[in-house]
């Protein structure tokens, strides 16, 4: 579960390394986000020469969580870290590469571009 002030690793090559969650989008008063949810975040660490800079406010979609997600068949999927991919307003990733595995739940959330760029879909 990702909430306000949560820090996440960035799983793409947009230039950001770490982001801090500002708000969870989707409904009024929503407190937590899970895999496939969109958040508003600020960039806390960035690499020089990247597409995004430190201090920018961006939208991101969560691709991995430590707490995991329950699937329809009753199984759970958990990852070793919390990670997100920075996206544009039209749900396309700002980077051109995705690092690490992503969850299959992104397919249901209409993030097909991220799923196709990912090296592994679990």
From Swiss-Prot:
A Pfam family per the record: Ribosomal_L14
BP terms from Gene Ontology: translation
UniProt KW keywords: Ribonucleoprotein, Ribosomal protein, RNA-binding, rRNA-binding
Keyword Ribosomal protein tagged: yes
InterPro entries: Ribosomal_uL14, Ribosomal_uL14_bac-type, Ribosomal_uL14_CS, Ribosomal_uL14_sf
Domain of life: Bacteria
GO MF assignments: large ribosomal subunit rRNA binding; structural constituent of ribosome
GO terms for cellular component: cytosolic large ribosomal subunit
HAMAP family for the chain: Ribosomal_uL14
Function: Binds to 23S rRNA. Forms part of two intersubunit bridges in the 70S ribosome.
Family recorded in the similarity comment: Belongs to the universal ribosomal protein uL14 family.
NCBIfam families, A to Z: rplN_bact
Subunit structure: Part of the 50S ribosomal subunit. Forms a cluster with proteins L3 and L19. In the 70S ribosome, L14 and L19 interact and together make contacts with the 16S rRNA in bridges B5 and B8.
Full protein name: Large ribosomal subunit protein uL14
Organism this protein belongs to: Latilactobacillus sakei subsp. sakei (strain 23K) (Lactobacillus sakei subsp. sakei)
């Amino acid at each position: 579960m990702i909430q306000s002030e949560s820090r996440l690793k960035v799983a793409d090559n947009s230039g950001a390394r770490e982001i801090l969650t500002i708000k969870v989008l989707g409904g009024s008063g929503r407190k937590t986000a899970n895999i496939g949810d969109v958040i508003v975040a600020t960039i806390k660490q960035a690499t020089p020469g990247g597409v995004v800079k430190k201090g920018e406010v961006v939208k991101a979609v969560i691709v991995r969580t430590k707490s995991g997600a329950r699937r329809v068949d009753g199984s759970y999927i958990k990852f070793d870290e919390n990670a997100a991919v920075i996206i544009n307003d039209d749900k396309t990733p700002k980077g051109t590469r995705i690092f690490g595995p992503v969850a299959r739940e992104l397919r249901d959330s209409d993030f097909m571009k991220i799923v196709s760029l990912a090296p592994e879909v679990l």
